[in-house]
Structure formats: C-alpha cells, structure tokens
C-alpha cells in the first residue's frame, strides 16, 4: 500500500501520480524510468495529461480558460478527452461540476473539418 502525507494544513501543494493496477514492483520501476504520461498542466484551474503511446489527452478545466492547454480553451468548466489517429480527431466533453445546464464551447488552436457525428 502507498500513502501521501498531505500534512496538517497543506496549501498550494502540488503533486501528480499515475495508478498502475496489477503491476509488479519491477514493472512499476520500468514505467517510472520511461513514463508514457506527460503532465501538461497541474494547477487549481486545470489538470491535463497526454498519453504518448495511446495518443490520448485528458484535460479538466475547473473554470473557463482563454489560455489554451494542449491547444484547447473552454468557456465553462469542462472535462475534455481527445484522441487523434488516422481516422481523425475524436473529442469527448462533459461538465466536471455537473452543474451546467447549457452548452460548453471548446476552441481548438487549429482548423478542423465539420463534425462527422455529434450529440446535441
């Protein structure tokens, strides 16, 4: 088992970790030596990670953000997943607060074609 001692009154503490279920100590050490995950942002406003081998990026914006992270900005709190492959770009969007009753507008830092499929 593992634990991270946050202390009695942590303030502005920052850390990142990845869960590796069913991995041995040797497998965990090997992953640690050459991690697949790249932390793109880890602030109170946004957390973002990119998994290189899977070409997947996950972002949690806890507030609107005009400053792009991984080429993405949002006008409301949003959880965004992106995967790009030879078929194109797949994006998933949801509200991490579960309070939004309207829309979430995401802006990408590049041109994309018309959506092939979307949910209203």
Predicted features along the sequence, with ranges:
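Terminal accessory/anchoring regions of large secretory-pathway or extracellular enzymes
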Residues: 1-120
């Amino acid at each position: 088992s593992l634990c991270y001692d946050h202390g009695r009154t942590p303030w502005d503490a920052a850390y990142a970790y990845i869960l590796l279920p069913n991995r041995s100590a040797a497998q965990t050490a090997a992953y640690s030596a050459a991690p697949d995950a790249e932390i793109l942002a880890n602030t109170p406003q946004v957390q973002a990670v990119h998994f290189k081998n899977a070409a997947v990026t996950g972002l949690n914006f806890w507030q609107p953000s005009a400053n792009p992270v991984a080429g993405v900005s949002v006008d409301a709190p949003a959880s965004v997943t992106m995967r790009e492959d030879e078929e194109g770009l797949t994006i998933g969007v949801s509200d991490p607060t579960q309070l939004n009753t309207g829309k979430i507008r995401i802006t990408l830092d590049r041109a994309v074609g018309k959506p092939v499929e979307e949910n209203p």
